[in-house]
């Protein structure tokens, strides 16, 4: 990976509001009393997240964090339908996990295959024109709906690299050097800790078999709590099928190779217990140094792994590297392959289905609060400047049982009823709209 690497971002998305319906009537030369002909508003633009295999970082979201889709067009005369707002497509790397909070619950969608789309925010429905409200007893409907507001969401994006093999170990153990000799990747390499400050990917070919290796920046004790480079990089190990645990067998700078092995595995366990059970192959690196040769016998006996999963290598001279790769390829072939084929599929937030007709009534210090998806949507799409708007709301409150429920709860004349952002005064079962600021 070249350039800066960002694997976390927060964005705000705002889908387009629906267009307003029209409250118009036919005006034709020989039709003196033409009926309603107001058209519907267009749908607001949706906002999608799209998994793009050509991206490998969330860097673009460092500069741009807000995305707004277009509003739907208004309806017009002669039943003219407003045009739909243009959709917005936000491209993210394959392997991006999206999270949002809806009604107090956190929902997660994993964009782990090329082409997957997430409908991140749904555009509002266009308002109905007055042609929909005409009946035999109500032939001159002076009402049309406003467009429904588009969904607004704060979304957390987290990139988890898609790699078959993860290179783990303490800083300066030789992970980047190994990646550079087994693949075409060219990570920054220097003889001091924390040279690698971002994950690097490389494709390794063993005969006619290939796999992807991720060089994870060096871990230290306390990484599961965010110490050092911390859990911001541990997340990239989660999707790997196999770990190559690289140990500095020479014990440079007085390090204990056996202690390092156990310390790294403990960090993996504390971060995510399943990671400690992930298949591992150990590479005892720096075998070209005399100090390593003196430690090899002790290390082989101290490591709780079979001999066929412990390899003595020198990434600097390539000693033992080919044998290591053959073993890695063999282990991967024995494991189930991940299903990452392109998928032309649109996902939605996994929100449970609910009956939108349900509602709740709460007694508050200054009145009554009615909540419910259907009734709140009706209020948000009501143009209170239109003469017949209150009449429609009154009918819906009665038909839905809300009026009866309020009376059963003990509402009194003069009490205020709040629904969504609107306030109404209750009087003998009928409501009067209170302009904002009026009590």
Curated annotation (Swiss-Prot):
Residues 163-333 form the OBG-type G domain. One of its GO terms (biological process) is ribosome biogenesis. Its main location: cytoplasm. It is an enzyme of class 3 (hydrolase). InterPro entries: G_OBG, GTP-bd, GTP-bd_Obg/CgtA, GTP-bd_prot_GTP1/OBG_C_sf, GTP1-OBG_CS, GTP1_OBG_dom, GTP1_OBG_dom_sf, OBG_GTPase. Belongs to the TRAFAC class OBG-HflX-like GTPase superfamily. OBG GTPase family. Mg(2+) binds at residues 176, 196. Coiled coil: none annotated. An essential GTPase which binds GTP, GDP and possibly (p)ppGpp with moderate affinity, with high nucleotide exchange rates and a fairly low GTP hydrolysis rate. Plays a role in control of the cell cycle, stress response, ribosome biogenesis and in those bacteria that undergo differentiation, in morphogenesis control. It comes from Roseiflexus sp. (strain RS-1). PROSITE patterns: G_OBG (PS51710), GTP1_OBG (PS00905), OBG (PS51883), OCT (PS51881). Residues 3-162 form the Obg domain. One of its GO terms (cellular component) is cytoplasm. The keyword GTP-binding applies. GTP binds at residues 169-176, 194-198, 215-218, 285-288, 314-316. GO terms for molecular function: GTP binding; GTPase activity; magnesium ion binding. PANTHER family: DEVELOPMENTALLY REGULATED GTP-BINDING PROTEIN-RELATED (PTHR11702), MITOCHONDRIAL RIBOSOME-ASSOCIATED GTPASE 2 (PTHR11702:SF31). Keywords: Cytoplasm, GTP-binding, Hydrolase, Magnesium, Metal-binding, Nucleotide-binding. This is GTPase Obg. SUPFAM superfamilies: Obg GTP-binding protein C-terminal domain, Obg GTP-binding protein N-terminal domain, P-loop containing nucleoside triphosphate hydrolases.
């Amino acid at each position: 990976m070249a350039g800066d690497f960002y694997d976390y971002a927060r964005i705000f998305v705002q889908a387009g509001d629906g267009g307003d319906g029209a409250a118009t009537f036919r005006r034709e030369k020989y039709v003196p009393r033409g009926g309603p002909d107001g058209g519907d508003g267009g749908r607001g633009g949706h906002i999608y997240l799209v998994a793009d295999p050509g991206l490998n970082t969330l860097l673009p979201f460092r500069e741009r964090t807000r995305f707004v889709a277009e509003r739907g067009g208004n309806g017009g005369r002669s039943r003219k339908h407003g045009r739909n707002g243009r959709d917005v497509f936000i491209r993210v790397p394959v392997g991006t996990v999206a999270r949002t909070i809806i009604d107090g619950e956190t929902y997660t969608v994993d964009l782990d295959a090329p082409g997957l789309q997430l409908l991140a925010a749904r555009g509002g429905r266009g308002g109905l024109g007055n042609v929909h409200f005409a009946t035999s007893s109500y032939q001159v409907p002076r009402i049309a709906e406003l467009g429904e507001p588009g969904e607004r969401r704060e979304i957390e994006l987290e990139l988890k690299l898609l790699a078959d093999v993860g290179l783990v170990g303490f800083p300066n153990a030789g992970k980047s050097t190994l990646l550079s000799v087994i693949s075409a990747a060219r990570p920054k390499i220097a003889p001091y800790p924390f040279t690698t400050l971002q994950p690097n990917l490389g494709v390794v070919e063993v005969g006619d078999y290939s796999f992807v290796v991720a060089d994870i920046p060096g871990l230290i004790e306390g990484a599961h709590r965010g110490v050092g480079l911390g859990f911001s990089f541990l997340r990239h190990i989660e999707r790997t099928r196999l770990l190559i645990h690289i140990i500095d067998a020479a014990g440079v700078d007085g390090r204990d190779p056996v202690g390092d092995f156990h310390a790294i595995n403990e960090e993996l366990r504390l971060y995510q217990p399943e990671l400690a059970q992930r298949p591992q192959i150990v590479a005892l690196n720096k075998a070209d140094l005399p100090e390593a040769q003196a430690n090899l016998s002790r290390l082989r006996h101290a490591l709780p792994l079979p001999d066929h999963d412990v390899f003595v290598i020198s990434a600097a001279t390539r000693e033992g590297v080919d044998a290591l790769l053959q073993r890695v390829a063999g282990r991967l072939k024995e494991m189930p392959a991940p299903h990452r084929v392109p998928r032309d599929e649109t996902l939605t937030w996994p929100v449970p289905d609910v009956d939108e007709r349900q509602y709740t009534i709460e007694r508050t210090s200054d009145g009554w609060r009615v909540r419910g998806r259907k009734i709140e949507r009706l209020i948000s799409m009501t143009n209170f400047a239109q003469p017949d708007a209150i009449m429609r709301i009154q009918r819906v409150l009665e038909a839905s049982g809300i009026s009866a429920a309020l009376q059963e709860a003990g509402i009194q004349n003069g009490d205020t009823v709040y629904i969504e952002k609107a306030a109404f005064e209750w009087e003998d079962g009928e409501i009067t709209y209170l302009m904002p600021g009026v009590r």
